[in-house]
Amino acid sequence: MKKQFILFSVLVCNAISLFASNNTADTFDWRGASVYFVITDRFCNGDTTNDINYGRIVDYGTEQLNAATFHGGDFKGMKKKAKEGYFTDLGVDVVWMTDVYEQIHGWMSGSGSINDFPHYGYHGYYPLDYTQIDKNYGTVEEFRALVDTLHAQGIRVMLGANLNNPGYPTLLDAIQYDFAEVGLTPQQAAEHIREWSFDDFFAQRLTWSGWYDRPWIRMPDEHWDENNPLEATVFGMPDFKEERTEMVRIPAFL
């Protein structure tokens, strides 16, 4: 019985060894990859000087109101953790990062018309400018340094790419880029609007110009067929018209 147990233990150890070495640099296989998903903003704050950008507010005074603000995580923080061995100690093959491009500057309601909390694009899924990295995450050079660090550890980097839709049109962006006259200052647009009728500010958003205009996107209040998967919008988000074959004008703010 003792010999059988020893033999079983040896077989198990050999199997574990084979599994652990399954994804070397020469034999990498996505089917056996260990993928670690990182929401960059919520991982590690390595540089507090880049915590506030674009007129955003990060602290509204309570934990509930701050639930969807930017919390400070950035490329420097990820690089710091990588150098400490965080990912290698876990046996990670791939780090999957949320989208890194510039997000909408303002916020949208985090809970319907009640506006329980301001919801920013901290998660990377509310893109504004696909040609720039969001300053809250860091710089191009810092991003390259992070990727180089992970590559040196034999870790691949996978990026999110939300190409189906831009982020919501926000009041702060409307003011900063002169999309529309909403009757607010930039500071007022960034504050938590709850005592006013939030939706009234967007009553004319279909006429906003300089943003992603009608040739680019469809909006949910344009009465598209929401049962048609090619025309439906998700959670009221603007939807890029991927089916169009005509050339479109690059938005003025890009």
Labelled PLM ranges:
Residues 18-20:
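Boundary at the C-terminal end of the N-terminal hydrophobic targeting segment
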Residues 15-16, 173:
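Residues in and immediately flanking transmembrane alpha helices
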Residues 4-14:
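Sec-dependent N-terminal signal peptides
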Residues 27-33, 41-254:
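Substrate-binding/active-site clefts of carbohydrate-active enzymes
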